[in-house]
């Protein structure tokens, strides 16, 4: 029986100058994905992937760190300008946008794409603390 050699696919360095930054900010975590204009992911980072655990994932600082990491990885592919799509009600929305700008990406547009139901699913029950 012939043994297969373990060949891993090398990450190809694309040269993309404009893209879209998708910021998904929930009450528990913040995920930043940077894609090209067609929606193919170039770089991503989340508060959880950077080592934040538990309630620290939902902080604005964790969102800032996730946005910086994603911006740094996308700038290695030649990214210069981004449109920002923000989704969700979380605490890290503004912090992530500021971090993208501070990392050196030029922001051309900011859109709020939070899905709003036309009285769809029943929401979760209110918390009694």
UniProtKB/Swiss-Prot annotation:
Cite the entry's keywords alphabetically.
Answer: Ribonucleoprotein, Ribosomal protein, RNA-binding, rRNA-binding
Pfam family membership, one: Ribosomal_S11
A GO BP entry is: translation
One GO cellular component term, please give it.
ribonucleoprotein complex
Q: What PROSITE patterns would the database entry show?
A: RIBOSOMAL_S11
* InterPro entries for the chain: Ribosomal_uS11, Ribosomal_uS11_bac-type, Ribosomal_uS11_CS, Ribosomal_uS11_sf
Which Gene Ontology terms cover its molecular function? Answer: rRNA binding; structural constituent of ribosome
Q: How does it assemble?
A: Part of the 30S ribosomal subunit. Interacts with proteins S7 and S18. Binds to IF-3.
Primary role: Located on the platform of the 30S subunit, it bridges several disparate RNA helices of the 16S rRNA. Forms part of the Shine-Dalgarno cleft in the 70S ribosome.
Spell out the family assignment given in the record's similarity comment: Belongs to the universal ribosomal protein uS11 family.
Its recorded name reads Small ribosomal subunit protein uS11
Q: Which organism is it from?
A: Geobacillus kaustophilus (strain HTA426)
């Amino acid at each position: 029986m012939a043994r297969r050699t373990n060949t891993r696919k090398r990450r190809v360095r694309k040269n993309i100058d404009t893209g879209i930054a998708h910021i998904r900010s929930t009450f528990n975590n913040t995920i930043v994905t940077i894609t090209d204009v067609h929606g193919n992911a170039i770089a991503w980072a989340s508060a959880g992937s950077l080592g934040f655990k538990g309630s620290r994932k939902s902080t604005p600082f964790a969102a800032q760190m996730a946005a910086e990491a994603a911006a740094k990885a996308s700038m290695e592919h030649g990214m210069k300008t981004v449109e920002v799509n923000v989704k969700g009600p979380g605490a890290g929305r503004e912090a992530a946008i500021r971090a993208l700008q501070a990392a050196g990406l030029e922001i051309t547009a900011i859109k709020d794409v939070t899905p709003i139901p036309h009285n769809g699913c029943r929401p979760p029950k209110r918390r009694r603390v």
